[in-house]
Amino acid sequence: MKRLCRWSPLVLAAAVFCAAPAEAACTATFTADDAGTFPETLRFDRETKRLTVDLSGLPAGATVFRAELILQAAEPHRQVPTEPTTVYPVGAPDERLAFAGPLDRGLACLEPVRKALAAGEPLRLVVETTLAGVARLEVSYLEGRPRRRLPKVTGVAVRHRAGQTFVTFREPPLADVPEFGTGADVAAFRASLAEAHPDLRFRVWRSAKPITAETIAAARLVGECGPLTCWNDTYHQNKTKKEPPVRYRVRDLADPLPWGTGVWVHNPEAAGRAHYAVTAAVAGEEDFDALAPAAVAGPVTETVGPGEPVLQWVEHPDRWMYRRGPLTRLIYTRWEAPPRSSTPSSPIDYLVAMGDDPPPEGEMREPQYRAYRVEPAPVGLHLHCWGGSLNGGYGWWYNAHRGAVLIASNQIPYDWWTGYHARRGTRRTWGDGGVHPYTMDRLFAFLDWAMTQHARAPEAVRKHWRRLDPRRVFVAGSSMGGSGAPMFAVRRGRRVAWALGWVGVHVPAESPQFRSSYRHCYGPVDAPVTMAGRDVSPWDWFSDVWWLRHHAAEETGLVIASNGKNDGGIGWPQALAFARALQETRRPHMFNWDIQGHGTHTRVGANFEIDVRTDRSLPAFTRCSLDDDPGTATPRPKEEIEAERERLRAEAKREGKNPNHVKVDPFDGEPRGAFNAHLAWETETIVDTPDRWEMTVVLQDAAPADRCTVDLTPRRLQRLRTPKGRRFTYTVTRPDGGKSLAEGEATADAHGLVTLEQIPLLKGRNRVIIAAAK
């Protein structure tokens, strides 16, 4: 156990009211209760919705440089208003107070406070709508000192890296720090600190000039955090309590930050030189007299940018995620900030895994279990399920045998890999701002950065990186990840070549069990919440069915998906609606269903052999004569289900099987089946010119018939021009001058899509040629 000096909460609370020297400065608080610098000075009349704050405790002529009305945090399960936060000076409804950064936990009211002080009157505000009420008023001013002794921060250091400034500091020694064995130990220690020292926060100030008590008025508050920010309490996700604790590194492969070190990462809005200071605030009170040299740092030269991930550590397992090595795992942390997060300095971990050996020249045993190095390498974004983490829960390491580099991250928050409202981590309401695709954006931002690392990675790991192929990006996942993967391919079809998802939610509003999970991220279904900058509800925007039907001409990646008809939590009707939308909007897809519940996998396993790329055309197969019938998602009568269950149980008993394992389809249609299960195509011989398109389509040997008919729509065209109304001729033949199977004409529709209806295909290879009509 490390022995650290303590500061006592008794001393902390002791009144030390002193005359303020000219250079003194502090943050005082005005409260409704008996706490704070000026207790019982804040009053709210619920009938008139008027808030009055008695400012007479401030010295005459005080130089006020910050005033913030801190809003109350909402209790768990409290209903969040859907109206925007509305607070304004009495008689001035057009002067609504705006949120004050960095965490949007309060409203900026500097000018109203200055006006009230100049007039010698109380601050009077109308409070129409807030998250959960008002907690206190904070006023930072010169010529003042706090009424109690506050702790001091030391060891402040700053370092800038690629658009982000890392501010580290030594937290005040609060207690003896024990030896931590697990994350549960750290969590218990943090809880004890919060109980002994409630509402302790560390604030980061930034200025263009050195920061002292005399110059603090020129500084801006840019950061605020609680204790123990050196602890990475999200790396292991739901296993955090059982695993040894992980501490952050703020330099590539450096030592972890010592316990008791705080960290805040700031993205400056403008380039230049800056100075920083860190204060300790207790219930909002600050003492800027405490800005000794150890509490300030700078100058540091800053640039504007998103920042770069920091390499935390490297692993070299021989086996991992059902693949054999040698392998390399690189673990990074990126402190996310808007526009990739609703709040600044939000650390999220990322994993990059790759095989280190090149593939053998000849045949070898079980190559599907190996992970190889190829260049340029395909890249797979792997999205974990509920309860998973970047270390697993996404099915497989897909296409590692083809050299695919795995990228995974932790899902924070649980937004099903889509996005969430700007209010997360703040004290905004659903009416303040909108929903952003933060999660999608941050993953693609990490991918963009990863594309550069073959040339820019630290020397110690650069040999493991290889050029990544932006044309061969795919997304894969299971359950929650199986919901996100198709959403990526549907909305980011120009970047995602293909996606594979098991048992996903495709229409969030129609998931029987998980609709509430989405509601925490999007707001109520019937609320007037929209996507940021768009006049559309997030419940529509993140519905794959809505998106496909409202963006018929936009290209999507190949979607490979599966759902269980008896998966009551995810929901079969919404899954079938997705499959129908894929068919009816003519998208490249393979979809299968079964009655294996939440364990229904795609027919494509860990290795997908078709070389799908974003710079190559794709075929959309629909209405294939070999497709099975999924039904209409109409529930079967209960008596019919029970009769079938009893029949299957009796059969199981006769065969010596467990009768409790029988499964019955609760809906109409075939209990198991697929769309496009027996069709494939060759990628190397595609012809795509302004006036001609050719592809070899394969009816696979495992097909249940020697012949089929199918509609074929070329998608993701690279050069073929298909304006509305343009006429085309087509032929279907056996390759290499083989017999003709069909010929005809087709016309581009209103969306610029050309569909060859019910063309015949024979088992094996079939050449389809489309040419502009003369």
Say what each PLM segment does.
Residues 145-196, 285-313:
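Pro/Thr/Ser/Gly-rich low-complexity, intrinsically disordered linker/stalk tracts
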Residues 315-317, 323-326, 584-773:
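Alpha/beta-hydrolase-fold serine-hydrolase catalytic core, especially in secreted/extracellular enzymes
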Residues 398, 403-441:
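Cap/lid segment of the alpha/beta-hydrolase catalytic domain
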Residues 24-58, 75-76, 84, 89-95, ...:
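Flexible, small-residue-rich N-terminal segments that precede or flank a structured functional core
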Residues 506-618:
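The feature captures the conserved acid-bearing segment of alpha/beta-hydrolase catalytic domains
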Residues 430-465:
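Alpha/beta-hydrolase active-site loop
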Residues 282-378, 741-742, 751:
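A domain-start/cap signature at the N-terminus of enzymes
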Residues 179-272, 284:
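Recognizes extended acidic, P/S/T-rich segments that occur
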